Amino acid sequence: MKHIPVLEDGPWKTVCVKELNGLKKLKRKGKEPARRANGYKTFRLDLEAPEPRAVATNGLRDRTHRLQPVPVPVPVPVPVAPAVPPRGGTDTAGERGGSRAPEVSDARKRCFALGAVGPGLPTPPPPPPPAPQSQAPGGPEAQPFREPGLRPRILLCAPPARPAPSAPPAPPAPPESTVRPAPPTRPGESSYSSISHVIYNNHQDSSASPRKRPGEATAASSEIKALQQTRRLLANARERTRVHTISAAFEALRKQVPCYSYGQKLSKLAILRIACNYILSLARLADLDYSADHSNLSFSECVQRCTRTLQAEGRAKKRKE
């Protein structure tokens, strides 16, 4: 920070007391971030131009110019809202006399109320002090001296418009045979849209595949039933033929074995036992032994076995009757 020279006693002290109506301290505004009022950025813009006729009273303004830091120029955007014209226009040499001395000390505290620019807007805070020359990106460029008579203009610029979110591209239409996926839903939509979409797709798929007519379904079912019935009839016929063949063979064997009468009904098991004993009896007559254990039975024993088998079969028939 630059060193401020100390004022010497003499005419300077008298002039300062007269011009400022007493000793006052010049306060520097603190740094505060710029605020937004109803979505608009507010900032101060200095449109003052230096006047060559402005002469400091007894060197006071020259010293004020030396003590004021040099701010960096800011690019000026195109104003949107109309700015309030400065009050009182430009100052003349006569108006800068003793009557405007109180305004010299309070020049840095002046700002317009936003109520005059737009109703309902809050009063903007004072702008932060400009950055020092060592941190200024634009280099040490001198700004014209600010006249205390001229007042800054407050411009309102609309906030930058946000880009609208682009809609997602529609998925390509798949063939009707495949299942159609549900379209991507936005966060605000409910789950009922996806459910209705799935139901609608299923309805379209079912309508795309034609159903069988009632007449065709009846004809197909009747054909199936007829085929099954034919197969059952063929199986029954084969079983019947087998049973009839076996029954005929046992009947022929029964006629060859001895029995009480030819009209006597014998079971297949009884017919087989009588036939075995009858064969053993005939073998004993020929002096042959066909027995399983080679017991060498006599002819009378073989006849008794046949008799016992016929009697047991007769008793069984009587019990059944």
UniProtKB/Swiss-Prot annotation:
Residues 70-85, 121-132, 160-186 have a biased composition (Pro residues). It comes from the Eukaryota. InterPro entries: ATOH8_bHLH, bHLH_dom, bHLH_transcription_factors, HLH_DNA-bd_sf. Residues 244-282 are annotated as: Helix-loop-helix motif. Expressed in lung, liver, kidney, heart and pancreas. Expressed in endothel of umbilical vessels. Residues 93-109 have a biased composition (Basic and acidic residues). One of its GO terms (cellular component) is cytoplasm. It is found in: Nucleus; Nucleus speckle; Cytoplasm. It holds the Pfam family HLH. Transcription factor that binds a palindromic (canonical) core consensus DNA sequence 5'-CANNTG- 3' known as an E-box element, possibly as a heterodimer with other bHLH proteins. Regulates endothelial cell proliferation, migration and tube-like structures formation. Modulates endothelial cell differentiation through NOS3. May be implicated in specification and differentiation of neuronal cell lineages in the brain. May participate in kidney development and may be involved in podocyte differentiation. This is Transcription factor ATOH8. It comes from Homo sapiens.
